Amino acid sequence: MKLNIVPARTGLTWVKLGFKTYLQQPLAMSGLFFMFMALLSIATLIPLIGAALALALLPAATLGLMAATQEATKGKFPMPTILISAFRAGKQQVRAMLVLGALYAAGFLIIMAISALIDGGGFARLYLVGGKITEDVVRQTDFQLAMWATLALYLPLSLLFWHAPALVHWHGVTPVKSLFFSLMACYKNWAALTIYGMAWVGIFVVTMLVVTVIAAVLGNPAFAALALFPVGLLIMAIFFTSIYFTFRDSFTDTSTEESSTDISVAEGDPT
């Protein structure tokens, strides 16, 4: 397995490929994303363990969407069963994916525990259990500190797991190694990933502003309230479609030349 170092402009290419692939199979990719959201939402309804279970399922579910994108790039219509690809790859890989999910859940819950030390658990409770967000709560200094601490700590966690599910599934890498390789790939391609992330933040912000402006022009504030949610889900579906390309261009399969669980570094120029 070879790690490709890509130029910064590749970040924009990943975004474009996300839109292009989504438009090739809009019905399939939208449907799978909604199934993805429904699966995690249903998991959270289970008493006591719901939130942890949803977190543990997230790496496998994300892998399912990546597999769907891969199918779409081949001109195929991804079927609903592709969402559980991680659990159809043999006992060894299923076990590895479950371990990866458990590590992700543990890491996230540790972050929530740290945030609870800052504000007494207000932010963590709101995030994991839900509840009403009031202006008074948001203005609390401890709540804001807990929120920013969570965001700061989640960044390294997300980088550790960014490529990990795909490495486990497609390259047979062990969970611990997949975390290391994922972090290394994100570090080596930090410029492309930064451009990629900034582009998506820009797309989200501009889209929300456009919807708000349209509502203002129409003189109908209810339009914004009704449109923001489905439009936000649409953008999220395209975002998840694009994630596969960040993995595809970062790693090259060289299993015929060397062990697939070893890694070498090479300069690359995917466009």
Which ranges hold each PLM region?
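Hydrophobic alpha-helical membrane segments
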Residues: 1-271
